A protein has these predicted regions:
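Conserved anion-binding
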Residues: 115-116, 122-166
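A charged N-terminal "starter" segment
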Residues: 1-119, 124-136
Length: 166
């Protein structure tokens, strides 16, 4: 995106500062570059990183998947699919949206239940909570794996141990 100094000044005057300018073409290019580099990976965009509905819409239109951590984040994504035929909408929810908050509030699970979401869990207690408050959810067990050689140790933070998974 090329903006002249005068254009930036005018935008600041018209909209006040601070002012955030988002180039949706750059978002699309970055997404395509990522998919080209890792074609078999289905990455999920963390909506909490930037929940701007226009960014989510841009990513939706180019086939992105979404990681949501709250009901409002889910609804930002859902706005893009609410008018799809029912089966297509449900297929999108199961294939392209995952509720992966590590601490799942029972209220949020109840709000999500009618949408039959895909939900991660790390242990048997979480699975029981999901079953009670969001019985229509699909579930995905998050596995804790060693990350030997990583610069930042995160493997002890999330997921079930191998012995717990069986």
């Amino acid at each position: 995106m090329v903006l002249q100094k005068l254009s930036l000044q005018r935008l600041a005057e018209d909209n006040s500062t601070p002012l955030l300018i988002i180039d949706h073409e750059t978002i699309r290019e970055n997404y395509r570059s990522f998919k080209d580099a890792l074609p078999r990976v289905q990455a999920y965009y963390a909506v909490k990183a930037n929940s701007d509905p226009e960014i989510v819409k841009t990513l939706y239109k180019i086939g992105a998947s979404f990681d949501v951590a709250s009901f409002p984040e889910f609804m930002i994504v859902y706005e893009n699919i609410k008018n799809l035929p029912e089966k297509e909408r449900q297929d999108f929810i199961w294939d392209k949206i995952i509720y992966a908050n590590t601490i799942k509030q029972t209220k949020t699970l109840g709000e999500l239940d009618p949408y039959k979401p895909l939900v991660t869990y790390d242990n048997i207690d979480e699975l029981k909570k999901i079953k009670e408050h969001c019985p229509h959810a699909g579930v995905v067990l998050r596995i804790r794996v060693p990350n030997t050689g990583s610069m930042v140790e995160l493997s002890s933070k999330f997921g079930a141990l191998r012995r717990e998974a069986f």
